[in-house]
């Protein structure tokens, strides 16, 4: 169930403050964050966030298509190593 339009998108205020400080800078720094729950706002476009996945910070460059999604969607927390592959030498003919 989506969030109410009346309430607006959720975002941590400290992220918006950091983005607005870097707005006019030529060399933008990576913004390190643990806030996976924050919605990506249009003001975040063009910035790089290092989103924590529980182990390391993964750099995420924000583009227009990401607006409206959550930061955590672009920083996977689980690693998929694949299913076991059967050894073809052992198979009976």
From Swiss-Prot:
InterPro entries: Ribosomal_uS19, Ribosomal_uS19_bac-type, Ribosomal_uS19_CS, Ribosomal_uS19_SF. It comes from the Bacteria. One of its GO terms (cellular component) is cytoplasm. Pfam families: Ribosomal_S19. Residues 73-93 are annotated as: Disordered. Keywords: Ribonucleoprotein, Ribosomal protein, RNA-binding, rRNA-binding. One of its GO terms (biological process) is translation. GO terms for molecular function: rRNA binding; structural constituent of ribosome. Protein S19 forms a complex with S13 that binds strongly to the 16S ribosomal RNA. Belongs to the universal ribosomal protein uS19 family. NCBIfam families: rpsS_bact. This is Small ribosomal subunit protein uS19. It comes from Phytoplasma mali (strain AT).
């Amino acid at each position: 169930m989506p969030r109410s339009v009346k309430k607006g998108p959720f975002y941590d205020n400290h992220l918006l403050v950091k983005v607005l400080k870097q707005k006019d800078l030529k060399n933008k720094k990576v913004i390190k964050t643990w806030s996976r729950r924050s919605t990506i706002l249009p003001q975040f476009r063009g910035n790089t966030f290092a989103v924590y996945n529980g182990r390391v910070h993964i750099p995420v460059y924000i583009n227009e298509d990401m607006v409206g999604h959550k930061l955590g969607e672009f920083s996977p927390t689980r690693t998929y190593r694949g299913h076991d592959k059967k050894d073809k030498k052992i198979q009976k003919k």
